[in-house]
């Protein structure tokens, strides 16, 4: 008879609903601090356990792989109501382990398909203000790394990345990348890179529309930063952007600017070999441009001897045939350049 009274195992949807109820309670208890502390602690322990259970369903463990049907049920219930919004806003109330678990849950859910559809993308499109919340999370020292991870996973969806690129949020990353907290600055840099490289057509459209202010800020705030790490990351990312075929129109305009060329020539003179090599990969685009404006060609001619001496000293630590071939081609081009009449 005892077996008749055993509680039914909770379904994935049950666990999501319980999590949602506990998140509601957590919000309420913060609004009403008079609620009994022991009761609150008990509920927060339950909430942490529920979030851990969600993670277990989505990721499995050492003994069992995740079950596709259970993951689909969980995902469907999670995005049916405002569970994501409640989880994000309640994150500061959780302990560190629960925050980590919640971050992993949100990250995983961005990849979960239900009936061959990423329903997280549909939810975020209808609740796009959550991206405003996540971006501003970089300013919260305790929460930045959690919100940053979630933000990167959310911009896997092209519609979400487009919203961020079309907003004023992009400008905030020039500041976040240089925050004094090294871990947060590095996380912001990783996020900025993801935003500018993942969705090729969306990024190309953004750069064409915003190239004037974007590259002016990129040059002054990142490439000319006093911070070595910022300069190193920025010149590497610039190379990734300009060498991508999707951005060929933007690249052609970038390498037609005297101001841009001066900045690159300064980076070639850096004491850091890493920065020199990354700068070379962008500098070679100025030299290789078959339709150089006269002022660009004339600067290269006027500085020919200095540039050739500089290039002779730039060598990667490991033998790199491709780099050597590129450098030889650049040296030949510079050696053969002639002064032109300015248009």
From Swiss-Prot:
InterPro entries: ARM-like (IPR011989), ARM-type_fold (IPR016024), Mo25 (IPR013878). Disulfide bonds: none annotated. SUPFAM superfamilies: ARM repeat. It holds the Pfam family Mo25. It comes from the Eukaryota. GO terms for cellular component: cytosol. PANTHER family: CALCIUM-BINDING PROTEIN 39-RELATED, GENOME ASSEMBLY, CHROMOSOME: A03. Belongs to the Mo25 family. This is Putative MO25-like protein At4g17270. It comes from Arabidopsis thaliana (Mouse-ear cress).
């Amino acid at each position: 008879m005892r077996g008749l009274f055993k509680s039914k195992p909770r379904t994935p949807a049950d666990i999501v609903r319980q999590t949602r109820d506990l998140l509601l309670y957590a919000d309420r208890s913060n609004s009403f601090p008079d609620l009994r502390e022991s009761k609150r602690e008990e509920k927060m322990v339950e909430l942490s356990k529920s979030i851990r259970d969600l993670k277990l369903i989505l990721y499995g463990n050492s003994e069992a792989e995740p079950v596709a049907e259970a993951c689909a049920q969980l995902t469907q219930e999670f995005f049916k109501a405002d569970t994501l919004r409640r989880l994000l806003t309640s994150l500061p109330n959780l302990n560190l382990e629960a925050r980590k678990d919640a971050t992993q849950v949100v990250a995983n859910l961005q990849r979960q398909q239900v009936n061959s559809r990423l329903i997280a993308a549909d939810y975020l499109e209808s609740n796009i203000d959550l991206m405003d919340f996540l971006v501003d999370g970089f300013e919260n020292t305790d929460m930045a790394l959690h919100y940053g991870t979630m933000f990167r996973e959310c911009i896997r969806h092209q519609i979400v990345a487009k919203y961020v690129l079309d907003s004023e949020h992009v400008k905030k990353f020039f500041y976040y990348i240089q925050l004094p907290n090294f871990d947060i600055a590095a996380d912001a840099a990783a996020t900025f890179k993801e935003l500018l490289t993942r969705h090729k057509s969306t990024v190309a459209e953004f750069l064409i529309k915003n190239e004037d202010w974007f590259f002016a800020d990129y040059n002054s705030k990142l490439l000319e930063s006093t911070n070595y790490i910022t300069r190193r990351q920025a010149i590497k990312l610039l190379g990734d952007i300009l060498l991508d075929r999707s951005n060929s129109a933007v690249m052609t305009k970038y390498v037609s600017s005297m101001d841009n060329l001066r900045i690159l020539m300064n980076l070639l003179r850096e004491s850091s070999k890493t920065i020199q090599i990354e700068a070379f990969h962008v500098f070679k685009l100025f030299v290789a441009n078959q339709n150089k404006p006269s002022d660009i060609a004339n600067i290269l001619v006027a500085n020919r001897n200095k540039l050739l001496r500089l290039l002779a000293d730039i060598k990667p630590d490991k033998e790199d045939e491709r780099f050597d071939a590129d450098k030889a081609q650049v040296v030949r081009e510079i050696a053969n350049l002639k002064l032109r009449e300015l248009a």
